[in-house]
Amino acid sequence: AALDSGIQVKLNCVPQAGVNEGELEQLAALAETLPLEVRFIEMMPIGSGASMPCLAGPDVLARLQRRWPELTLLPQKPEPEFALGPAIYYKVPGWKGSVGFIAAVHGKFCAGCNRIRLTSQGFLRLCLASEAGCDLRTPLRSGASDAELLDLLRNAIREKPLEHHFGETGIPATRGMYRIGG
């Protein structure tokens, strides 16, 4: 129904060793006949994801390129009214859709990340891999003006971490992704 209505559809998959690795080619093949984006998202080593058997983005790409050697990198395109997102897209000539990769660990895109998240508790998270952010609930409930809230947002975003530190020893896994909007 969404595709028939012209709504852009993105189908996300987190490839996991021994869980869904046998389905990756079938998922990618959906983009052959359907105008959608099939995106493979690398498991972030956060919370329980730190101990899950994940597949690296470059390994999934190599696997799909063996199946479809003509899988070609697409030029980065800006999302409507937004800066570039974290996905890198590929397409087989003649396909209606594309295949994307979001590889936070093996394709660090921090420098170009334009994402922030607001938790259900009113905390603005600047990065999924960091506890950095600011409380927006308190000023909202205290009647802060739009200008004051905008100032808070701007100041917080200026503090957005430059990069994550996955792979460094001694970095504890933070809350589970389901608790931080990931």
Model-predicted regions and their roles:
Residues 93-123:
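Active-site oxyanion/phosphate-handling segment shared across diverse enzymes
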Residues 1, 33-35, 108-109, 124-125:
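Short hydrophobic/aromatic-rich motifs at helix boundaries and adjacent loops
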Residues 45, 106-107, 130-132:
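Short, solvent-exposed loop/turn segments at secondary-structure junctions
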Residues 3-100, 104, 140:
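Radical SAM enzyme [4Fe-4S]-AdoMet core and its adjacent flexible, acidic
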Residues 111-182:
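Flexible mid-to-C-terminal extensions adjoining Fe-S/redox cofactors in radical SAM and related proteins
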